[in-house]
Amino acid sequence: MSNSTSTPNTGLSYKDAGVDIEAGDALVDRIKSVAKRTTRPEVMGGLGGFGALCKIPKGYEEPVLVSGTDGVGTKLRLALNLNRHDTIGQDLVAMCVNDLLVCGAEPLFFLDYYATGHLNVDVAANVVTGIGKGCELAGCALVGGETAEMPGMYEGEDYDLAGFAVGVVEQSKIIDGSKVKAGDVLIGVASSGAHSNGYSLLRKILDVKNVDLTQEIDGRSLADAAMEPTRIYVKPVLELCKQVDVHAMAHITGGGLPGNLPRVLPNGAQAVIDEASWEWPELFKLLQREGGVEQFEMYRTFNCGVGMVIAVDAADADKTIQVLNAQGEKSWKIGHIQDNAESIEGADEKIRVIFA
């Protein structure tokens, strides 16, 4: 005869293992409206499919697809420490689409990867809202992503981000640096702050020197200045490309001016940067002062106030500045290109880019 006494159900569930499927579903429901605001006419279908479909925009004769992926580095650690999650998504989009822009590409769509130890729906929704804002600023569609709850891989609600962007450019209009020549003028376009690079050093300085994040610089707190989202240059620069023959562009990210300008210079070309042409924003002055950081170390770690550099013919320099400034981008002549027989491919960054 069987024992009729009921026993509690001791079977384990996915939730017991630390993965909350309902939380993931709740997040998807909350971000559908965000994705909808970013849609483009070329996008076929909405969120939720196994793959996102997108047509090539009309008007291209020989379209070339351009792809890129990036993250936001340890700026994410600062965001977690400050409990500020509303702008880090914009940083993620900016890092990807500004890279596509360098070759003249129009961003089409964006996908994100969000990995965490324990999914906090409110935090994740804030992050994705920032991603949506970034996509709107860049004119690209948020077509999907992946949210991975991985207990044991990340501490608590800590999370990591990665972004993936795809754009398109007319083959005959690809900007690859091949037109760069001696005498070209370099136009600097202002950054909004440290963008998303150099934050390991930035955080080290703040920590070692016990810097007060509430102190005011440039009319706002240091915390606000450090978390200012990366500027998205897509729309102003694409407009510039319609009006001016752009020879090359460099997105000033990790490696700063000396690390990124050589990536778009032809062999034998040397960039001469006029240090007196701009004043560093207060954030970088503070970091150099508090950390005792050498000048060249600053230049190869931070953008130092320059988020993008554009090379144009000297005859187009003034028009380039005029077009960019008219669209709200602060820009100026930052230097020029000269020939240098010693500047061979793969040469030391101090040779390829000199500061005068």
Curated annotation (Swiss-Prot):
The keyword Heme does not apply. It comes from the Bacteria. One of its GO terms (biological process) is 'de novo' IMP biosynthetic process. One of its GO terms (molecular function) is phosphoribosylformylglycinamidine cyclo-ligase activity. InterPro entries: PurM-like_C_dom (IPR010918), PurM-like_C_sf (IPR036676), PurM-like_N (IPR016188), PurM-like_N_sf (IPR036921), PurM_cligase (IPR004733). GO terms for cellular component: cytosol. Pathway: Purine metabolism; IMP biosynthesis via de novo pathway; 5-amino-1-(5-phospho-D-ribosyl)imidazole from N(2)-formyl-N(1)-(5-phospho-D-ribosyl)glycinamide: step 2/2. Its main location: cytoplasm. It catalyses: 2-formamido-N(1)-(5-O-phospho-beta-D-ribosyl)acetamidine + ATP = 5-amino-1-(5-phospho-beta-D-ribosyl)imidazole + ADP + phosphate + H(+). The keyword ATP-binding applies. SUPFAM superfamilies: PurM C-terminal domain-like, PurM N-terminal domain-like. CDD domains: PurM. It is an enzyme of class 6 (ligase). Its EC number is 6.3.3.1. It is found in: Cytoplasm. Keywords: ATP-binding, Cytoplasm, Ligase, Nucleotide-binding, Purine biosynthesis. NCBIfam families: purM. Belongs to the AIR synthase family. This is Phosphoribosylformylglycinamidine cyclo-ligase. It comes from Acinetobacter baylyi (strain ATCC 33305 / BD413 / ADP1). The lineage of its organism: Bacteria, Pseudomonadati, Pseudomonadota, Gammaproteobacteria, Moraxellales. The gene is purM.
